[in-house]
Amino acid sequence: MNKFAKIVSIASAMLIVSTTGLSVSAAKVDTLESKNSSEIAIPFTGEGTTLDVDENLPSSYSSKDLNLVTPIRQQGNAQICWAYGGLSSLETLLIKDGVIDNSSNSWYSAAHVDAWGTPRKDGTGWQREYYKGGGFPYITMGYLSSWSGGVSENEFPYTSPLSLFDINKKYNINNVVTGIMYLDSEDKDTIKKSIKDYGAVTTHYDEYSKFSADDTHSYCPGASNYINGHCISVVGWDDNISKESFTVNIDGTTYTPKKDGAWLCRNSWGNYNDFDGYFWISYEDYYIFSDVFGPSYAFTDYMKNNVSNTIHQVETFGATYEFDYLDEASKDTTYINVLNIDNTNEYLNKVMFESTSVGANYTLYYIPVDNEGTPSSDKTTWKTLKTGKVPYSGYYTADVDPLYVSKGKIGIGVEIDTTDTKAINGIGVSEWLENKDERIFNTEAKRGQSYIYTDKNIFPNIPSLSKSKVNDVMDFYEDVNDDTEGGNFVIKGITYKRGTLAGDANLDGVVDIEDAVCIQKSTIHSYTLSSEGQINADINQDGAVNIKDVTEIQRLLAKVTGDNQ
């Protein structure tokens, strides 16, 4: 099986640096032309997002100084920097928004995401060892976007053995991720604005002792023969940090950046220096924000989780590639997932998908499914849920008007139209990965999960793909490329069970006088209810949110009925 010519020669993207053995790496390669390069099917890098920065950014910023960070972590010998780098950025966003405090009680468990990122009993998943298998940033993003975490450190401590991990165990996950943005590694203002808006950005650099001017200043001046990927959370910057602070001597040659300025980085080695475990890395470092180790990313959105919310998905590992194989054949393609709705009284109110087609037009559809589980090819039977533009590269969740969905199978389609853009047409796909020596990731994809819809026949010479406008993506993989493993699309439906928390207009998990106030304010347009809040607010279920619902909540709280008054 080949990989659509997408197996590339590149430095290993594994992120493995622990407190000890800082010069040890799974790959000791230089650039893409290095004779030591290996052919490795690394996860895609995709197009990062460049933001329109219409504000004057300050010369310095620090989430650390603003106390928007949890206590520093200590990864010890465990090669899980990729877990700490991602989780700590999410912690900072939640602290910034006042959702959690900045104590160690708010730590997310790196051990849990590490265990989650090991092979399942059926052989699917990431093919790596617990604690010492290195990792990719995609593991953390897949873990959080599938709502498998974050799990509290108190529930799954650092010292937990792998035997304690149970994929089916239900944890108390209070907040779930709904947005992750990949960043343009070359646009400094985009990165600064993301740090300022979201508190932190997760990225990676080349950790090697010769690149350290001291234990608080790091600078790699150019392509290195000592690639040793290390993941960190960048929580600030300072344009005036002296370039002289980063002078390094490498094999007898002295290097100093040309300009002042540096990024403030949160490490995961405990309080190993006199800067509380933080350090500065020069703006001119060769590998900081490089896509050699995968995309740099920021968490943009999340939602409060409760028993009423359910995420419906055919994959749980997230995007390992971008399905952009049809770009040259079709600039307007609909990608479809068939999802199982297990309960009654479910209302679809959000759709999450992963795409790097920044700026492309998208249309979300509800698509009927026949008795065999195949989405309808008759587009007149589809219901448009929402239209818009792909706002950034990464995982995006769109709110849709609540739609009742029956128990059983439903189709959710994401049409991507890149006709008027330079973007490549694609959708995230959970697809198998390997390098020349070993398998990296095994997909859980099966037939009947993901489909492709095109208005024109782009497979005229492939009978199995030319009979219908709707084709199982597994047929594409097998018939076009002799690949029987394939992958499935990253398209998820989020539902809300109506009536479970009737009256909970502000979605704080309880029904109290604050909900009545929120509803009353919404009637005079001084408060905007979310789509979930509108469902809950309509406590008398008359199809409208008004003062009658306020009265019903007041009666509920007083535990009296209208007949008793």
Regions picked out by a protein language model, each given a short descriptive name:
Residues 2-25:
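Sec-dependent N-terminal signal peptides of Gram-positive bacterial secreted proteins and lipoproteins
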Residues 18, 22-25, 497-565:
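Cellulosome-associated attachment modules in secreted, modular CAZymes
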Residues 24-53, 565:
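Low-complexity, acidic Ser/Thr/Pro-rich repeat tracts that form intrinsically disordered stalk/linker regions
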Residues 29, 47, 54-66, 83-91, ...:
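Predominantly the structural core of cysteine protease catalytic domains
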Residues 68-78, 126-130, 505-507, 539-541:
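A short glycine/serine-rich beta->alpha loop
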Residues 77-100:
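Alpha-helical support elements that line or immediately flank enzyme active sites
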Residues 359-445:
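Aromatic- and Gly/Pro-enriched, solvent-exposed loop/edge beta-strand patches characteristic
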Residues 433-500:
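PGST-rich, cysteine-poor low-complexity/disordered linker and tail segments that act as flexible spacers
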